[in-house]
Amino acid sequence: MVKLPLPPGTFPTLWNADKRYKENYMTNYEGYYQTYDAGHIDDDGYIWIMSRTDDIINVAGHRLSTGAIEEVLSEHQSVAECAVLGIADKLKGQLPIGLVVLKSGVDKDNETISKECVQMVRDKIGPVAAFKVVIVIKRLPKTRSGKILRGTIRKIADNVEYKIPPTIDDPAILTEIKEDLIQHKILNNG
């Protein structure tokens, strides 16, 4: 949340959606703008935005924060950045999968890193997360401002039609993600 008034340079509304803007961002807590971001301030005073508070998945009736799972994955010594998303599952509703980008110079094999990441989530969050899949990828699709395109990745994984966002940094990454999901049998090739 950000205390009002908003600083110069922030948008006072959404294009053609002033009412929706006020309902979604200005009415939850009087005098504050609701960002739906979660983060922390480190010892040096830097603000770290870690996840969205509205990115909750439903795994067999349990509401889980993908941000909490991402936080665990980011603690792995070989992980540079990651994204967790819930993919559709007929039995459990959704299942979390992790996509991780490794730091340069990592000499462990991808399978070992994936197993270690799965075990870390099991140890810190518990078996209720049903977290069993970590895919090591080269890079994550992002907007030019650095936001990871989780919604687009989720649509690709669920084999749902998606549009390439106009703000994407490099559209070729989406093809790479699709190929990785097919290779790991998350997405059906046909």
Residue ranges: model-predicted function:
Residues 134-144:
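Short proline/glycine- and acidic-rich turn/helix-capping motifs at secondary-structure junctions
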Residues 52, 137-139, 151:
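Short, loop-centered acidic/histidine patches that primarily coordinate divalent metals
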Residues 5-7, 12-13, 20-23, 31, ...:
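AMP-binding/adenylate-forming catalytic core of the ANL superfamily
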Residues 83-84, 135, 161:
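Residues embedded in well-ordered beta-strands within globular domains across many folds
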Residues 179, 187-190:
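C-terminal low-complexity, glycine/proline- and small-hydrophobic-enriched intrinsically disordered tails
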Residues 161-169:
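A short N-terminal helical cap/helix-turn-helix that marks the beginning
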